[in-house]
Curated annotation (Swiss-Prot):
This is Palmitoyltransferase ZDHHC23. Keywords: Acyltransferase, Golgi apparatus, Lipoprotein, Membrane, Palmitate, Transferase, Transmembrane, Transmembrane helix. It comes from the Eukaryota. Interacts with NOS1. GO terms for cellular component: endoplasmic reticulum; Golgi apparatus; Golgi membrane. Expressed in the brain (at protein level), with highest levels in olfactory bulb, piriform cortex and hippocampus. The keyword Repeat does not apply. Residues 103, 152-159, 318-347 are lumenal. The chain crosses the membrane at residues 82-102, 104-124, 131-151, 160-180, 297-317, 348-368. It comes from Rattus norvegicus. It is found in: Golgi apparatus membrane; Golgi apparatus, trans-Golgi network membrane. Belongs to the DHHC palmitoyltransferase family.
Length: 429
């Protein structure tokens, strides 16, 4: 007799979601209209607040997670989740700048508090090692709002020509293009095919022994430099120095989280949760890492932003403070608070100056690091371990590991992200 085939039990298909329904963090179907229902953590928090009792940190985290999960907008095939961190800049920035334009003292208080609040939020998220769209939202909305104030309050006064407006608009467009390019893949490392899972010596060598062609020659990997007065021949071959140095170094090159062997200068970003080739740092302003593939676009975005910002500041000051130099008008502009339009423009100028000064500092640090062929992660590591050569009170840090001279360092930076032709190790001097 033929064996009777058992019929497979068909799983019931999930019904499509309507525009107001969604799957919550518990895996259950929920509705936007029920966002205020079943809020036990919020009820507990309100009760403890009304009775003057301290709120436990885990309760605050659960309340935040619940709010962020239920904050959604109706959309096709289910309600879409709105990241709550993008909302504060959209609401607070226009309100605070308009309040600051009421009086000189209010402007001092508000413009002093804004950087402090931003730094506090940065250290809060940095300590928790989590991604946030707050700074990206703040940057993009600041660009848009400054441009809006310029069109509404400065251009109608008739002192800005069409060519100047077109040049400023072009600069803003180029900033957005460079930011889009900088937010793309910074050079994430893919996991090589290897079945071994633990970072023992034999298992670390597995990707090289079994699939040397796979791990060999990562695109754009730094292939030259001097370490202890000798050339890194293994870097010239495009592979990590695993299996050739000490076991301690082999374990250092192995990433237990990504289960791969990192090439030279690559590092695991704890915020993004992945390894990045030639990682410089994690930039909160683009909510992404700055690595081998997007470092050039990051520098380009900074340079265009600085030029456009300085140009916009000069146009605004020449309009609201006539017949005065830029530096004098920035600190002494009599009658600027006489009307609302000039007061708001002057407040936005000072806000732009604060942002521009911060970006100029980042740009200066980047130029110094590129000139010495070091990444920001290598600089911080050298400062912690008290290694390398420090100049100008630590502003300049030269590890001496990859420094090949000013021109060669910039030439190497200009070719980041391109697939280079590796020369034999015997030809490298």
């Amino acid at each position: 007799m033929k064996p009777v085939k058992k019929k497979k039990t068909e799983e019931p298909e999930l019904e499509p979601l309507c525009c107001c329904e969604y799957i919550d963090r518990n895996g259950e179907k929920n509705h936007v209209a029920a966002c205020l229902c079943d809020c036990q953590d919020l009820d507990e928090g309100c009760d403890r607040w009304l009775t003057c009792k301290s709120l436990r940190p885990e309760t605050c985290e659960r309340i935040t997670d619940t709010i962020s999960d239920r904050l959604r907008i109706p959309w096709l095939r289910g309600a879409k989740k709105v990241n709550i961190s993008i909302l504060p800049p959209l609401v607070l920035l226009p309100v605070l700048l308009r309040v600051a334009s009421w009086h000189f003292l209010l402007g001092v208080v508000v413009l002093t508090s804004l950087p402090m609040l931003a730094l506090w939020y940065y250290y809060l998220t940095h300590r928790r090692k989590e991604q946030t769209l707050f700074f990206l939202s703040l940057g993009l909305f600041s660009l848009g709002y400054m441009y809006y104030v310029f069109l509404q309050e400065v251009v109608p006064q008739g002192h800005v020509g069409p060519a100047q407006l077109a040049l400023l608009t072009c600069g803003l467009f180029l900033i957005l293009v460079a930011l889009y390019r900088a937010k793309k893949n910074p050079g994430y490392l893919s996991n090589p095919a290897c079945n071994d899972k633990s970072p023992s010596n034999s298992q670390i060598e597995c990707p090289i022994k079994k699939g040397q062609e796979k791990t060999k020659g990562f695109p754009g990997t730094d292939t030259s430099g001097s370490l202890n007065n000798r050339t890194l021949k293994d870097d010239a071959k495009g592979s990590s120095r695993v299996g050739l140095d000490s076991p301690a170094k082999s374990k250092e090159d192995w990433c237990a989280k990504c289960q791969l062997v990192r090439p030279a200068r690559a590092w695991h970003c704890r915020i993004c949760g992945i390894c990045v080739r030639r990682m410089d740092h994690h930039c909160v302003w683009i909510n992404s890492c700055v690595g081998e593939s997007n470092h050039q676009a990051f520098i380009l975005a900074l340079s265009i932003f600085l030029l456009t910002s300085v140009y916009g500041i000069s146009l605004t000051l020449n309009t609201i403070c006539r017949d005065r130099s830029l530096f004098t008008a920035l600190f002494y502009c009599p009658g600027v608070y006489a009307n609302y339009s000039s007061a708001l423009s002057f407040t936005c100028v000072w806000y732009s100056v604060i942002i521009t000064a911060g970006m100029a500092y980042i740009f200066l640090i980047q130029l110094i690091n590129i000139s010495y062929n070091v990444t920001e992660r290598e600089v911080q590591q050298a400062l912690r371990q008290k290694t390398g050569r420090r100049l100008l009170c630590g502003l300049i840090v030269d590890t001496g590991q990859y420094n090949r001279g000013f021109l060669r360092n910039w030439l190497q930076f200009s070719t980041l992200g391109t697939r280079t032709v590796h020369t034999p190790a015997e030809d490298i001097v």
